[in-house]
Amino acid sequence: MLMKCLPAAILITGLSYIFLIPEEPLIIKILFKVLPMLLILLYARTNVGRRGRYQSLILLGLFFCMLGDGLLIWFVFGLSAFLIGHLFYISAFFGQWNFSWLRFATILPISIYSTWISREIVHSLIEKGEHNLIIPVICYVTVISLMGWAALMTGNAAAIIGGLLFMISDSILSWNKFIDDVAFSGPLIMLTYYAAQFCIANSIRRKPSFHVSKGLKSERLIQ
């Protein structure tokens, strides 16, 4: 029963934070930002599927990302928490390595993209005189790019979608924060972020949480 209710609760609390909660008071804003992540963490904990090391690493990743949500008002501390969370995700995904030349080759476009966006951000930071952020930002872009590629290498649809959505979310956030304003950046960042974390939590399942009927084959996640 709990597993059936949690996705709806995650959706409701996530949309409430994005569209209803005001910027002030800040403590209320932070609490509502963390609440969907707490529910996603609970969802991952009660998920029946890859028990053991994979689930433990995903849970640790979710926890540090939730911590990052609360600390992001102190940017470097929040960024550090997210970086640690991604390291746990990377470890979990590489533990589910499922080699394919096609998936392996995605390292090239991901590397090109991460190099390009890193250069754009660094150029902007230099112009603004924020040299102290250059190394942390480069480290973070490198780690999240590796996380996205590691997710692709699992062959797990939920992990892949989650990893790519996370990259999209952080790309919008980085561009908006360091380079130029992005229209509707707030909703876009958080919608893709919560969706990414939910998909990563759902990757614990051994079977997909949905199926396609009426002439279409049910999707099977590659283990």
Task: Label the model's feature ranges.
Residues M1-Q223:
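Polytopic alpha-helical membrane-helix bundles and their juxtamembrane interface segments
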